[in-house]
UniProtKB/Swiss-Prot annotation:
<dbReference type="GO" id="GO:0042104">
    <property type="term" value="P:positive regulation of activated T cell proliferation"/>
</dbReference>
<comment type="function">
    <text>The insulin-like growth factors, isolated from plasma, are structurally and functionally related to insulin but have a much higher growth-promoting activity.</text>
</comment>
<protein>
    <recommendedName>
        <fullName>Insulin-like growth factor</fullName>
    </recommendedName>
</protein>
<dbReference type="InterPro" id="IPR022352">
    <property type="entry name" value="Insulin_family"/>
</dbReference>
<feature type="region of interest" description="B">
    <location>
        <begin position="39"/>
        <end position="67"/>
    </location>
</feature>
<dbReference type="GO" id="GO:0005615">
    <property type="term" value="C:extracellular space"/>
</dbReference>
<feature type="region of interest" description="Disordered">
    <location>
        <begin position="108"/>
        <end position="139"/>
    </location>
</feature>
<dbReference type="GO" id="GO:0008083">
    <property type="term" value="F:growth factor activity"/>
</dbReference>
<feature type="region of interest" description="D">
    <location>
        <begin position="104"/>
        <end position="113"/>
    </location>
</feature>
<dbReference type="InterPro" id="IPR022353">
    <property type="entry name" value="Insulin_CS"/>
</dbReference>
<dbReference type="InterPro" id="IPR016179">
    <property type="entry name" value="Insulin-like"/>
</dbReference>
<dbReference type="GO" id="GO:0005179">
    <property type="term" value="F:hormone activity"/>
</dbReference>
<feature type="region of interest" description="A">
    <location>
        <begin position="83"/>
        <end position="103"/>
    </location>
</feature>
<dbReference type="InterPro" id="IPR022350">
    <property type="entry name" value="Insulin-like_growth_factor"/>
</dbReference>
<keyword id="KW-0732">Signal</keyword>
<dbReference type="GO" id="GO:0043410">
    <property type="term" value="P:positive regulation of MAPK cascade"/>
</dbReference>
<keyword id="KW-0339">Growth factor</keyword>
Length: 139
């Protein structure tokens, strides 16, 4: 009888601990989802500058947006006048908003219509020509 009571209490402890583990795991997953779904984060000072440097890379950035999405009301107009500090430090900003403050690439970097010359191929063509000329002379 004593063994049955001990076994029963151990069993109930195991069941309770498994339930706690499931509950804890569920709460952790929910917390992870909620933090991942956060759309904006406040960034100030050097943290804001470092983030802009990372997002904008070689293009550089401005503290006032250079290109603003199409305006559809007062909310968009007020956003156009604000700088990045007001947006990101006081309210919080998203990656999309940060990208609005990046400088545009130079015209040469944007122009994909003009073909780029490849000197490597040109040197291969000149070698082929000299090889074929050389063969013709030796015959």
């Amino acid at each position: 009888y004593i063994r049955r009571v001990r076994q029963g209490s151990i069993y109930s402890l195991l069941v309770e601990s498994q339930q706690w583990c499931k509950l804890t795991l569920t709460l952790l997953l929910l917390l992870a989802l909620l933090t991942r779904c956060t759309l904006s984060e406040t960034l100030c000072g050097s943290e804001l500058v470092d983030t802009l440097q990372f997002v904008c890379d070689d293009r550089g950035f401005f503290f006032v947006p250079q290109h603003v999405p199409p305006r559809r009301g007062a909310h968009r107009r007020s956003r156009a006048r604000k700088g990045i500090v007001e947006e990101c430090c006081f309210k919080g900003c998203s990656l999309r908003l940060l990208e609005m403050y990046c400088a545009r690439p130079s015209k040469a970097e944007r122009d994909v219509a003009r073909p780029r010359q490849r000197p490597h191929r040109a040197s291969q063509h000149s070698r082929r020509g000299s090889q074929s000329r050389g063969r013709g002379r030796s015959r």
